[in-house]
Design a protein with these regions (language model features):
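Conserved micro-motifs of the catalytic ATP-binding
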Residues: 3-6, 43-46, 119
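Conserved glycine-rich
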Residues: 140-141
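ATP-lid-like helix-loop hinge signature
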Residues: 63-88
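Detector for a conserved hydrophobic position within an alpha-helical segment of the HATPase_c
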Residues: 135-136
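Short conserved segment of the HATPase_c
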Residues: 102-115
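A conserved beta-strand-to-alpha-helix junction within the catalytic ATP-binding
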Residues: 9-21
Length: 159
């Protein structure tokens, strides 16, 4: 999958994230999405469409993961928590969910970025590899953190 070259412009990541959350909650309002941010605005020189795709894909993965878990586990809090903040040099994004998590992967967590690697019945395995490419093109780094309940994803962009 070839990505078009990013077109960099100054965009507000807070409103970009809010747009994606709103869209995903219209598609599925059974999950509580909490968005915490320290600033009114976080401006970042980025390709708006591409970063929007990253936000959308990652939150959608969290939603699907929570649904997957709810097929087996009945009583748990269906939460996604998203945090966006900045320092002088970096912008940090943390997405934390209560879904199935990464602990039950039969493989190394690093493999989830490989093209065509998928754990979904109808997955193509391209979602996260595209997400990773976009993040790299934006001077960023993605990290997958295992935790007991659910998954945590950290992305750090250099300004």
């Amino acid at each position: 999958a070839r990505m078009p070259k990013p077109i960099f412009q100054n965009n507000d990541l807070i409103s970009l994230m809010n747009d994606n959350i709103k869209l995903l909650q219209e598609l599925d309002n059974s999950i509580n999405i909490k968005f915490v941010n320290s600033d009114q605005k976080i401006l970042f020189n980025c390709d708006k469409e591409q970063l929007s795709r990253v936000f959308f894909n990652l939150i959608k993965n969290s939603i699907e993961s929570i649904h997957q878990k709810s097929e087996k586990v009945t009583n748990f809090k269906k939460n996604i928590s998203i945090e966006l903040n900045q320092t002088d040099e970096h912008i940090n994004l943390i997405i934390d969910d209560t879904g199935v998590g990464f602990n039950n992967l039969d493989t190394d967590i690093k493999n989830i970025l490989n093209p065509y690697f998928t754990t979904k019945q109808k997955g193509t395995g391209l979602g996260l590899s595209i997400v990773n490419k976009i993040i790299n093109d934006h001077n960023g780094n993605i990290e997958f953190v295992s935790k007991n309940e659910g998954a945590k994803i950290k992305i750090i962009f250099s300004k």
